[in-house]
Amino acid sequence: MKNVTGTATSMKRIELSRRSPQYWRVTLNHPPLNVFGPESIPQLNEIVTALETDKEVKVVVFDSAVEGFFLTHYDFLAKIEDTTALPPGPTGLQPLPDMLVRLSRASVVSIASIRGLTRWIEPFGTFCRDGSER
C-alpha cells in the first residue's frame, strides 16, 4: 500500500486484542480474501513473541474480521525476495515455520475460530486447536 506521498506503508493485517490478562484474541484482517504475505510475518512474529514471554496469558483465539474468509493462502503476487530476505527465527527455521513451531510450543491454549473459507489453514490450523460453529 502507498500513502499520499507515494511511499510504501505497512498496514496492520493482524490485530491483537488483550481481552483480559489471561485471554487474548488475534484477528486476521486483510480484505478481501485474508491472504497472508511477507508484510504479515513481522506482525505475527510480534504476537507469537508476546505469547511466549507473557506469563499471564493462558488462551489465545485466532479469528477473522473478513466475512467468509478465515485464511486463504500465501500472497503469491508479493516479490519472492520480500519473503526469502527475512531472517530465520529463533528456532533456526524460516520465519513462517518458525512461528508455527513456536506457537505449538507456547504454554497457551491456541484456538482457531473458523468462520469461512480456509485454503491455507492446514499449516496454521495444525498448530492450533480448531474451533468452529459447524
PLM segments and residue spans:
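Conserved CoA-thioester-binding segment of acyl-CoA-metabolizing enzymes
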Residues: 2-63, 67, 101
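Hydrophobic/aromatic residues within transmembrane alpha-helices
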Residues: 26, 62, 75, 124-127
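Nucleotide phosphate-binding site architecture
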Residues: 34, 77, 133
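Residues that form or flank phosphate/diphosphate-binding pockets in enzymes
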Residues: 35, 71, 121
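Glycine- (often His-adjacent) and acidic-residue-rich active-site loop
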Residues: 64-99
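Glycine-rich beta-to-alpha active-site loop
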Residues: 97-134
